[in-house]
């Protein structure tokens, strides 16, 4: 069987012990033995998926992204302004907004991007903004924006180790579906892309698909197809069907942004990636880098 022109893998119908002698004899002739139908079919399924993925491996795409100055700075989290700049340069749609350093600037930006708005403290040293009161949502008037700015700014200044860049002003987004798209670096395999339902659904459903980078938009489409939450993107419960091509393109571009930080990336996460019909926007962005290893 080991020299047969097609693969032959014996699978026992019941899970039984096989002696070392029997296993050695089978291995000598290039034969793999799987005990039990459940274990055997699972192993064969994994082997086929590995074969399919191996056939999709491509040479890395040309890097379109130049890592901004933050990549050369001290290791740790980036200011969200720098993280947004990285994604925008890679071609990831980012929710419009601006950095305000005064209440007047916050009001000007709010009316430019459209009320109601969200305000977030912007500091590389403050990653969990909500925990310190550094986020206010749904501000719909000039007075609310001014009050929100002062509140958020004060929350940031109350963190002794934080350098506050300003207050990020962005429009509120409602409806649609929230996704998570992020990249972490595995010590053995390198950068790994995770895609799943975002927002409140991340911990509830634990519904994610993983790939090693690089990926293209076609591969991201396959990742989306693996999600149990795919019906939400297809218009379930009265939501507008999402443009899966637009979603896939944005996530593939996020992968390019991660690859631009080769050698320094620890984590890059967008949660949520807001999707509403053909609109796709990164609402919250986190980038963490580390010092480049000396060669």
What spans do the regions from the language model cover?
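ATP-dependent carboxylate/acyl-activation modules
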Residues: 1-295
